[in-house]
Amino acid sequence: MDRLDAIAYEDNLIGNVQQLAQQVKEGTYRAKLVLRKWIPKLGGKLRPLGIPAIADKLLQLAVAKILEAIYEQDFLSCSYGYRPRISAHKAIKDLTGELKSGKYHVVVEADIKGFFNAINHDLLMDMLVRRIDDKPFLKLIRKWLKAGILETDGQVIHPLMGTPQGGIVSPILANIYLHYVLDMWFEEIVRAHCTGHIYLCRYADDFVCAFQYSKDAQRFYKALIQRLARFGLEVAEDKTQIIEFSHCKVRAKTKFDFLGFEFRWGVNRWGKPILKRRTSRDKLRASLVKFKAWFQKHSGLPKKILFAKLN
């Protein structure tokens, strides 16, 4: 579960991989316990970090690649997170372009509360069955969902919800879940019931929806709460808001954060509306704290080496 385990596994890599393949083929493979460590976050909170066994990581990588090949043709253009050749930078660029168009006047900024730990296993498996009829393949995924979590105090927890902690397969499973829960629903149902322009930009469980009309945004938000509840999810109220966001109302000085950037309307030197974007204050503060800790740790190094590390 650590660097030493990886080195030991690599010493007999071919033999270990062959043994793993044989276990999968014979149906004797068992997912190992996932070691969970707690990492400090800004503000004194802790976040869990799952560390799967090396063999499980390798097998999950193979399964993730297969899922990617199946679902990339299904995923919609509004989904940006954890996809090949699609980055957070593209999400920011596309969102900026849409907002600059002037078609939208209201923004719903939303985040799903504890999303990765709240995914319903049975509902996720039902979604996978829609596209995959290979029972042994699906059984592998079920094993990882149910794999025990080993706490640092020796306690073993068997999760009833959520994607595999620290698992390579977790991001694409999360995308598949929200593809059905949010993306398709937004494009097929929400769009049909709105009277104006609408737009969705989602990166994992963080998303922004833009609307031409306030009444559409208000109806959407009410429907969103009900929709998420059907799948065992809820919005994080402290990270969710409905705001007027229009080039026609620059004086409102409204703003929202998405993927580490703050968006707001302002005016240029000629007094014309302009969409402004800058690093969000929370993101900047976190980066400064991280840099300060790094600098204190390395301040004793010679300047030449220190500057090389900074570059």
Language model features: what each stretch is:
Residues L49-I66, Q73:
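Hydrophobic alpha-helical hairpins/lids featuring a short glycine-rich hinge
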Residues K146, V235-I305, K309:
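A conserved non-catalytic segment of reverse transcriptases
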Residues M1, E68-C78:
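Charged boundary/loop elements
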Residues N16, Q23-G27, K32-L33, K37, ...:
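Conserved polymerase palm-domain catalytic core
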Residues M1-L13:
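Non-catalytic, polymerase-adjacent accessory regions of viral genome-replication enzymes
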Residues G50-I54, L58, I132-P136, I168, ...:
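Structural motif
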Residues P48, L59-Q60, N117-I119, Q218-R219, ...:
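Short helix/loop capping segments that flank catalytic or ligand/cofactor-binding pockets
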